[in-house]
Design a protein with these regions (language model features):
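Short secondary-structure boundary micro-motifs
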Residues: 1, 59-61
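Hydrophobic pocket/interface hotspot
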Residues: 1-2, 77
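A solvent-exposed, acidic/Ser-Thr-rich amphipathic alpha-helical stretch
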Residues: 2-49
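Eukaryotic basic, amphipathic alpha-helical target segments in cytosolic regions
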Residues: 9, 13, 32, 61-63, ...
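A short linear-motif detector with a strong N-terminal bias
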Residues: 16-19, 31-34, 53-56, 65-66, ...
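Generic alpha-helical propensity signal that fires on short helical segments
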Residues: 29, 42, 59, 73-75, ...
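A short hydrophobic beta-strand element
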Residues: 47-59
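Short beta-strand edge/turn micro-motifs at domain boundaries
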Residues: 54, 64-95
Length: 95
């Protein structure tokens, strides 16, 4: 997963900011395992060839599909990095 982020990457996870590969990976590894059920996905290119994405859906914790949490995520994919594109900015909000 490290190749999806660079030291320029930022993640806002429910209002808390994490900057750089190390901090972002540590946060993601500390969260409970979930299944993401994507309900909507929109994307468009930006003026500098980044990709702006918006996703909404359900998070299912511990296999409890009857009690999903709703999430919204907006992120920018930037050309570069070892994977070709990387998460430049990512905002995740869980409702």
């Amino acid at each position: 997963m490290n190749e999806l982020f660079t030291d320029a990457s930022t993640l806002s996870y429910d209002g808390i900011l994490f900057e750089g590969v190390t901090a972002i990976i540590a946060k993601l590894n500390s969260t409970p395992k979930t299944v993401h059920k994507i309900l909507t996905f929109d994307a468009q290119s930006t003026s500098n060839n980044d990709i702006l994405c918006f996703v909404t859906g359900d998070l299912i914790f511990d296999g409890k599909a009857s009690d999903p949490w709703i999430f919204a995520e907006t992120f920018i994919l930037r050309n570069g990095g070892t994977a070709g594109y990387f998460f430049y900015n990512d905002i995740l909000r869980i409702n």
